[in-house]
């Protein structure tokens, strides 16, 4: 059964790319990106089991507006956005160096036997990391 897309009811323009960060697994290995969501609402971050989309959906518009004015949050946010952009366009990667002719032909590998993160439910009926779900 397909899952409904997560709608974030309100996101101030100044931090509008939070949704983009939340939908890119980049946040799961980038410490500063995870810190953004932790700062946004630490109890909710834990309650949602570190699911940034669910957290954005459940965060009060007033809290989002407050973060959009907070200089510490904005400095961290701007750094995360810059890192995300660098990673998306950086030609200085192993793949780009080893396979320059394939730079514009990305590769995706999907296997339902591996769990990416608990916020990305993949159910295959197999054992492994998903067996506890």
Q: Which role does the model predict for each range below?
A:
Residues 1-133:
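Catalytic cores of glycan-processing enzymes that make or break glycosidic bonds
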């Amino acid at each position: 059964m397909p899952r409904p897309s997560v709608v974030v009811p309100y996101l101030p323009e100044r931090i509008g790319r939070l949704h983009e960060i939340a939908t890119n697994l980049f946040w799961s290995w980038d410490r500063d990106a995870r810190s953004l969501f932790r700062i946004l609402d630490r109890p909710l971050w834990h309650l949602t089991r570190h699911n940034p989309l669910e957290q954005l959906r459940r965060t009060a518009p007033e809290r989002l507006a407050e973060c959009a004015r907070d200089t510490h949050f904005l400095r961290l946010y701007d750094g995360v956005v810059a890192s995300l952009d660098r990673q998306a366009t950086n030609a200085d990667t192993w793949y780009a160096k080893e396979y320059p002719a394939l730079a514009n032909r990305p590769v995706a590998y999907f296997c339902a036997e591996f769990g990416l993160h608990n916020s990305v439910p993949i159910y295959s009926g197999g054992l492994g990391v998903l067996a506890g779900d």
